[in-house]
Every structure is written in structure tokens, then in C-alpha cells.
Amino acid sequence: MWCNPIICALDTYDINHALRLTKMLYGKISMVKLGLEFFTAHGLSGVQAVSDCGIPIFLDLKLHDIPNTVGKAISVIKSLNIAMLTIHISGGRDMMLSAIDSIFGSMIKLIGVTVLTSIDDSDLKDIGIDRSSIQHVMLLSKVAQEIGLYGIVCSAFEVQEVRNQCGKDFKLVVPGIRFEDDYSDQKRVKNPKDAILAGADYLVIGRPITMSSDPIQTVDAILSSINL
């Protein structure tokens, strides 16, 4: 980890809000996450503006396309100061290998997306996947590690089993971190302490921080709850 496990998810198209929060949280968190909403609105220049604030960037684009397209997209993205970038493991081995080839010469770490935290077993069944969410995550995690990705994104419910399967050096990024009274649109979620105890390396936390009246106090409370 860079300094602590918290990645603040700036899920917004408002660049001024994103910059304000990034500057406020400098030195308090490990990274900020910029996703599709922000990237669609502001592109490479917007990512660069946030990066200029000095906090490492977790660019969560969940790339999923043919190998050549993903490779070329990453060749453009790697001009930015990005710490981690997400790609879908379900894009296949050739796509992931193309992504790995394309980050050569940069500091970018590739993180594989397994099963979104908004999806549960019934959703998987609807799209023709007969495995449970944890079985599917375990399968995809194994493939990602064999290919050579830096780590994966999974829910806190799968962390312990993935850790046992993949070992201590494979990084586990856990989104869907909520407090007990706020599960919103996420289905497979846990609170910060439970996620860390289960074996998470990074916690992606959005609204509990970004919608707080005092984001710094909220971050301090989260760190205190996990004894950091």
C-alpha cells in the first residue's frame, strides 16, 4: 500500500467538486478513484488535472473490448500519471495480455474486475452463468493471477477465499464499502473493518466520504475503526 487502504471514489462529473475533495484529502488517503462518469465528461485533461493535485489516481474504466482496441486505449492512457487501471477479466486472456503489453514502460498496475458488487447470484443466472458469485470470482481471480495482473476487484464477501487461493502478494481492491445504514445500490457489501479483517488491501469508499459534511473527519473515523 502507499500509505493507508482508503481509495476515495470521486463518482461525479463535477470537476470542481472532484478537485476540491482531492485537495482536501491530500495526505489522508492512498488514492482517488475516477470512473466512467468523470472520464466521459472530462477525458484525459480532467484526469491530469486531478493527478496534478498529487494524489495517485485509480482510473476505473473497466475496459472490456477486443485486444487491439484495449491495447491502443491503454497506450493513450499511459501518458497520464496513473497508479492503477481496471480491465474486465471476462475480456479474456488475449485482451489481458494486450493490456499488459501496452503498460510496458509505465508505472500503471492492472486490476482485474471480477463480479460487480451490484450483481448477485440471481443476476448471474439471468445472463447464463450457473456458478455462484463467489465461485465465479474465484475462477476469474485464478485466471487474472495466472495472466499476471497486479490484483483484482472483488466484494468483501469473496476476499478471504481469494486471499487463501492467491496468496498475500495479489492485491485485493474492495468496493461497495458502506456503513451499516447505507447499502444504496450495492448488494454484496460490508463495512470497512470487516473488509480489512477479511483480507482487503484497498477499500474503495465513495458516498460516505464525498457526501459527508466533514470528509476529513469521516476518513479519520474509518481509519480509527480499522486501527490505522
UniProtKB/Swiss-Prot annotation:
GO molecular function, one term: orotidine-5'-phosphate decarboxylase activity
GO cellular component, one term: cytosol
Gene Ontology biological-process annotations: 'de novo' pyrimidine nucleobase biosynthetic process; 'de novo' UMP biosynthetic process
SMART domains per record: OMPdecase
InterPro entries per UniProt: Aldolase_TIM, OMPdecase, OMPdecase_AS, OMPdecase_bac, OMPdeCOase_dom, RibuloseP-bd_barrel
A Pfam family recorded for this sequence: OMPdecase
Active-site residue numbers: 62 (proton donor)
EC number: 4.1.1.23
Pathway(s) where this gene product acts: Pyrimidine metabolism; UMP biosynthesis via de novo pathway; UMP from orotate: step 2/2
Catalytic activity: orotidine 5'-phosphate + H(+) = UMP + CO2
Chain sites annotated for binding substrate: 11, 33, 60-69, 117, 178, 186, 206-207
Enzyme class, UniProt record, top EC level: lyase
Alphabetized SUPFAM superfamilies for the sequence: Ribulose-phoshate binding barrel
Keywords from the UniProt entry: Decarboxylase, Lyase, Pyrimidine biosynthesis
Keyword Secreted belongs to the record: no
CDD domains in the record: OMP_decarboxylase_like (cd04725)
Keyword Lyase listed: yes
HAMAP family, per database record: OMPdecase_type1_B (MF_01200_B)
Function in brief: Catalyzes the decarboxylation of orotidine 5'-monophosphate (OMP) to uridine 5'-monophosphate (UMP).
Subunit and interaction comment: Homodimer.
Recorded family membership: Belongs to the OMP decarboxylase family. Type 1 subfamily.
Name assigned to this protein: Orotidine 5'-phosphate decarboxylase
Organism: Ehrlichia canis (strain Jake)
Gene: pyrF
